[in-house]
């Protein structure tokens, strides 16, 4: 398996990329907009995953690629409610399988070739260091008005950090927070940002996420989502106040059934299913 990624995207895709490397033995091929069909033929593997979009020359060569019976996939890492939906639909119309981190996204296309691979637990995603808690509340994401409104309210009462880091630097900071928030950039978004939430859950960080109208339908996602505290946007501040007023008890109640060994067993089963049904 090869994963074709534009160089500028790599920092933003670290966990999802690493999952394919660790659990599926993938190798990364860094490409840019000039990447062409001949280069692809030199790099191609039995399975070829392209992140987010196809480079222009590769998109134009899709009929040739399919004629050669080369397996290519598009990997979507966006919330389809506000971007990339047309790109996904175009790939699906060409009978190309689209791998998606979110089963909620798949409900927007209802296409048999739009397939779900969640961000699965793997060892390197967990920060094993015993870090001191320094912040009451953390948030990691772009600066949008509906997010900054919540963070400003909470900053008046609590020690809040807006984490503008990626990868391990971000993870170390989130590990030092009692609560980490997941707030949608826009009120029209309808999917849970599991690429942001699942690393937090795997590290047993209390995660408060804004509710979504769509519901995670996969067995794996349903199990992991049990450890996320979902709340409506206008209740985020009061929920944080409730949690922090009795943090230890609330934390223990959320994670009382968290079992890393059980989750890893689920991962093993999920990998087997993915290999049979998606990468066959």
Curated annotation (Swiss-Prot):
<protein>
    <recommendedName>
        <fullName>Uncharacterized protein R358</fullName>
    </recommendedName>
</protein>
């Amino acid at each position: 398996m090869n994963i074709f990624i534009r160089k500028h995207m790599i920092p933003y895709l670290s966990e999802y990329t690493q999952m394919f490397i660790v659990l599926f033995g993938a190798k990364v091929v860094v490409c840019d907009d000039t990447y062409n069909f001949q280069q692809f033929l030199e790099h191609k593997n039995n399975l070829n995953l392209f992140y987010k979009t196809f480079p222009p020359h590769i998109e134009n060569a899709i009929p040739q690629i399919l004629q050669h019976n080369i397996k290519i996939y598009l990997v979507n890492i966006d919330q389809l409610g506000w971007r990339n939906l047309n790109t996904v639909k175009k790939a699906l119309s060409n009978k190309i399988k689209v791998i998606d981190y979110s089963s909620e996204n798949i409900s927007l296309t209802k296409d048999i070739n739009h397939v779900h691979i969640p961000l699965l637990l793997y060892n390197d995603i967990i920060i094993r260091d015993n870090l001191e808690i320094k912040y009451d509340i953390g948030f990691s994401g772009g600066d949008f008005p509906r997010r900054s409104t919540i963070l400003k309210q909470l900053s008046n009462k609590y020690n809040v950090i807006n984490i503008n880091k990626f990868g391990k630097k971000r993870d170390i900071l989130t590990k030092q927070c009692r609560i980490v928030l997941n707030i949608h950039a826009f009120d029209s978004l309808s999917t849970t940002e599991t690429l942001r939430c699942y690393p937090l859950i795997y590290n047993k960080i209390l995660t408060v996420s804004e509710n979504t109208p769509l519901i995670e339908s996969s067995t794996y996602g349903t199990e992991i989502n049990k450890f996320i505290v979902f709340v409506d946007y206008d209740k985020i501040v009061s929920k944080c106040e409730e949690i922090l007023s009795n943090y230890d008890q609330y934390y223990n109640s959320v994670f009382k059934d968290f079992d890393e060994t059980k989750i890893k067993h689920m991962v093993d089963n999920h990998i087997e299913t993915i290999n049979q049904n998606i990468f066959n």
